[in-house]
Amino acid sequence: MSVFHDEVEIEDFEFDEEKDVYHYPCPCGDRFEIPREMLEMGEDVAQCPSCSLLIRVIYDPEDFVKLETISTSKPIAEPV
């Protein structure tokens, strides 16, 4: 069981589009981070790369559902 420094809503994070990572300030001076891919997988723990602190990210997993496209081997026939 992890001990969290805090619980923070995803809306309070900053999103780095270039790195596809959410950031939130850490008391040590660095930033907690969690990649969008981890949120899509249901992960809710952001770590600081400089210290041992963890925070729990509060978010709606449905907002991060990765939509998959399904390809069909047959072309779809148009109605005549």
Swiss-Prot record:
InterPro entries per UniProt: DPH3/4-like (IPR044248), DPH_MB_dom (IPR007872), DPH_MB_sf (IPR036671)
GO biological process per UniProt: protein histidyl modification to diphthamide; tRNA wobble base 5-methoxycarbonylmethyl-2-thiouridinylation
Residues that hold Fe cation according to the record: 26, 28, 48, 51
Reaction catalysed by this enzyme: [3Fe-4S](1+)-[protein] + Fe(2+)-[Dph3] = [3Fe-4S](0)-[protein] + Fe(3+)-[Dph3]; 2 [3Fe-4S](0)-[protein] + 2 Fe(2+)-[Dph3] + NADH = 2 [4Fe-4S](1+)-[protein] + 2 [Dph3] + NAD(+) + H(+)
GO CC field: nucleus
Cofactors required: Fe(2+)
Protein name: Diphthamide biosynthesis protein 3
Domain of life: Eukaryota
Domain notes from UniProt: The DPH-type metal-binding (MB) domain can also bind zinc. However, iron is the physiological binding partner as zinc binding impairs the protein electron donor function.
DPH-type MB domain sequence ranges: 4-60
